[in-house]
Amino acid sequence: MTKGTSSFGKRHNKTHTLCRRCGRRSYHIQKSTCANCGYPAAKTRKYNWSEKAKRRKTTGSGRTAHLRDVHRRFKNGFQVGTPKGARGPENH
């Protein structure tokens, strides 16, 4: 029996399937855990030894890009309406 390359050709069962949280094919079927995001754990899996992976997944890298300007609007108190100068000269 060989335990190297020739044995790998005989493998045909899927160990990982799609994860319902991160969408990657990293959910280990027998372990019932995701190798990428750590599902079903409450906290998302992330490590400091992979700075690049953290950069890919962090807030503001996808649909939450609008959060970049939330901080600026927070500083101004979430003002609404047109700014004072844009209304034209004020005549009383």
UniProtKB/Swiss-Prot annotation:
Give me the Gene Ontology terms describing cellular component: cytosolic large ribosomal subunit
- The answer to whether keyword Phosphoprotein applies is no
> Which InterPro entries does the record match to this protein?
Ribosomal_eL37, Ribosomal_eL37/eL43, Ribosomal_eL37_CS, Ribosomal_zn-bd
Keyword annotations from UniProtKB, A to Z:
Metal-binding, Ribonucleoprotein, Ribosomal protein, RNA-binding, rRNA-binding, Zinc, Zinc-finger
Does the entry feature the keyword Ribosomal protein, yes or no? Answer: yes
Q: Name one Pfam family in it.
A: Ribosomal_L37e
State the Gene Ontology BP annotations.
translation
NCBIfam families assigned to the protein according to its UniProt record, in alphabetical order: PRK04179.1 (NF003214)
Protein's name according to its UniProt entry: Large ribosomal subunit protein eL37
Q: Which organism is it from?
A: Emericella nidulans (strain FGSC A4 / ATCC 38163 / CBS 112.46 / NRRL 194 / M139)
Taxonomic placement: Eukaryota, Fungi, Dikarya, Ascomycota, Pezizomycotina
Point out the gene that encodes the protein.
rpl37
